[in-house]
């Protein structure tokens, strides 16, 4: 009997005393991710990148059948020659970025499945030489709900298109891709042209700006994306 896929779910940290509400939001998404993967019979493990030795993070990523890179703080702007001060800027995690970039570049080089979500999309783009808009204007977020319902349109013949040519999603971000990284192609956009998904042209590596792990849609949106990457491996 075949073994279930092993999934390494990379996130930043398990505690943010300076931002408890943000930590609770990320914990909710991590819990929904684990529940959606467990419902598929997959074996998933949360890996806090800042709380484990870098060698251990890399080892766990290599041992997994697929890696998920979750959301969190903004990517360190020094990594793409971005502005150090901008609206909404806050704490950065340069060491987490460095380790995750290594995992991502290795996944591309060795054609191992990897899915980036929100910050994970931005990290993948920067890891491969792309840049970001430091702050997007006009993205309105309600105080009682940081997730905005929107619709993205997928490019034909892409993994994202398997969710439907036009899919309703939940977003929560104030940054977005400016210049697309090497070897990546755009696979979905929002109605205002914002890049909402990318995939590598050769490796089973992709990323989405929205949150397919949002509890209300995780079973319907997260698992199909992971399955598509496993099928490409």
Region spans (language model):
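N-terminal beta1-alpha1 cap of cysteine-dependent amidohydrolase-like domains
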Residues: 1-112, 126, 133, 137-148, ...
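Gly/Ala-rich beta-loop-alpha elbow adjacent to hydrolase catalytic centers
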Residues: 116, 120, 125, 129
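Active-site glycine-centered loops adjacent to acidic/histidine catalytic or metal-binding residues
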Residues: 118, 173, 211
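Short catalytic/ligand-gating loop segments at beta-alpha or beta-beta junctions
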Residues: 169-174, 198
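Short beta-strand segments that buttress and anchor functional surface loops
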Residues: 186-189
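Active-site-proximal beta-strand elements of phosphoester/diester hydrolases
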Residues: 206-210
């Amino acid at each position: 009997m075949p073994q279930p896929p092993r999934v390494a779910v990379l996130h930043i940290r398990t505690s943010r005393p300076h931002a408890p509400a943000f930590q609770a939001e990320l914990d909710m998404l991590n819990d929904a991710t684990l529940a959606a993967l467990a419902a598929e019979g997959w074996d998933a493990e949360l890996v806090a990148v800042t709380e484990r030795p870098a060698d251990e993070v890399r080892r766990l990523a290599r041992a997994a059948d697929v890696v998920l890179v979750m959301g969190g703080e903004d990517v360190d702007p020094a990594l793409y020659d971005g502005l150090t001060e901008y609206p909404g800027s806050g704490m950065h995690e340069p060491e987490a970025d460095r380790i995750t970039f290594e995992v991502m570049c290795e996944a591309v080089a060795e054609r191992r499945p990897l899915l980036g979500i929100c910050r994970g999309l931005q990290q993948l783009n920067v890891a491969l030489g792309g840049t970001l808009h430091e702050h997007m204007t006009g993205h309105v977020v309600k105080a009682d709900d940081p997730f905005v319902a929107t619709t993205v349109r997928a490019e034909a013949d892409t993994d994202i298109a398997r969710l439907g040519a036009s899919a309703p999603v939940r977003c929560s971000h104030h940054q977005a891709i400016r210049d697309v990284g090497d070897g990546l192609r755009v696979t979905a956009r929002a109605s205002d042209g914002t890049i909402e998904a990318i995939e590598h042209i050769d490796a089973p590596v992709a990323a989405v700006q929205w949150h397919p792990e949002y509890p209300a849609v995780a079973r319907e949106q997260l698992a199909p994306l992971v399955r598509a990457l496993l099928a490409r491996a």
